[in-house]
């Protein structure tokens, strides 16, 4: 969070797997309850309905403005960011993003969606919040994650933002983003998750918890028997192979350019990929894009005076 003229600038990176702010990460799962849930932890109370947030992930949808749950997830994300600073009431300027090639067509609808209520009262984890939305800045996903290190982007560079639902690809030549050379592929980490779960079911006839697969993808291992681990590892290696094949489709050549990877897919490349570490930079900070949104919005609003 940043502050400018008594307005709190709060960035929210609306991922299919996680909602990120500059200082918080929350899985996108959401379940409604008519009465207060028995167990505590990330409970949102809005318009008389209780929502448990953070169990599992949401399924891919191409237009988030068509899904009311992303509005609720946004309220939770804002509350969690404000809670870091012990703030309960604020004038809020939102900073968010959309996939590279979708932002042109979806920008205004998504802005209207996020600003649908100028003033909101709700409870998050038993704490009252009162928000007044005063504006919203929207940016292309991925690029903001590296905006503070553009000085490193000499020559030809390829940026791959590999999220849970999509992979955004952008060329950056001599510190300048090439708008005519950007693509969005529906090839996110969730594709690997689905393939891994199916492989375990096909090979062993059992279902595996998604949280177990996620631990393997993030850290390269988990407390399971070697046969299951080998099965999932093989799927993950193939997924990373397919990532590089997709990048080559867009003329990626490691000898001629540097590759920068942001998003959750970076840990899969690190854990299961074969690549030249001197030519590939993996940005581990899962909140990097949200921090970039925040910085860009702050600079833009400051210039306006």
Where are these regions (language model features)?
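Conserved blade-register residue in beta-propeller folds
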Residues: 21, 169-171
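Nucleotide/phosphate-binding catalytic cleft detector across ATP-hydrolyzing
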Residues: 1-159, 176-191, 203, 211-305
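Ser/Thr-glycine-rich phosphate-binding loops at phosphate-binding pockets of nucleotides
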Residues: 162-168
């Amino acid at each position: 969070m940043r502050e400018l003229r008594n307005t709190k600038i709060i960035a929210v990176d609306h991922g299919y797997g996680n909602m990120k702010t500059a200082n918080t990460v929350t899985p996108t799962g959401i379940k409604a309850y008519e009465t207060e849930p028995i167990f505590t932890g990330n409970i949102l109370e809005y318009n008389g309905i209780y929502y448990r947030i953070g169990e599992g992930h949401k399924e891919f949808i191409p237009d988030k403005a068509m899904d009311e749950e992303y509005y609720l997830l946004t309220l939770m994300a804002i509350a969690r960011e404000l809670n870091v600073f012990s703030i309960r009431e604020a004038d809020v300027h939102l900073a968010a993003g959309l996939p590279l090639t979708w932002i042109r067509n979806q920008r205004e609808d998504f802005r209207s969606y996020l600003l649908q209520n100028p003033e909101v009262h709700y409870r998050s984890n038993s704490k009252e919040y009162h928000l007044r939305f005063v504006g919203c800045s929207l940016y292309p996903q991925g690029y903001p994650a590296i905006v503070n290190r553009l000085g490193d982007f000499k020559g030809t560079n390829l940026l791959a933002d590999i999220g849970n639902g999509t992979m955004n690809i952008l060329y950056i030549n001599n510190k300048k983003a090439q708008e005519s050379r950007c693509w969005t592929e529906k090839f996110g980490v969730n594709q690997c998750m689905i393939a891994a779960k199916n492989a375990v079911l096909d090979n062993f006839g059992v279902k595996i918890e998604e949280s177990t697969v996620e631990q393997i993808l993030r850290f390269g291992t988990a407390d399971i028997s070697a046969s299951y681990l080998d099965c999932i590892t093989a799927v993950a290696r193939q997924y990373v192979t397919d990532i590089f094949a997709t990048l080559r489709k867009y003329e990626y050549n490691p000898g001629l350019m540097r590759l920068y990877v942001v998003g959750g897919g970076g840990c899969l490349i690190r854990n299961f990929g074969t690549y030249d570490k001197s030519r590939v930079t993996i940005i581990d900070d899962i909140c990097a894009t949200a921090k970039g949104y925040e910085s860009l919005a702050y600079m833009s609003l400051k210039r306006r005076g």
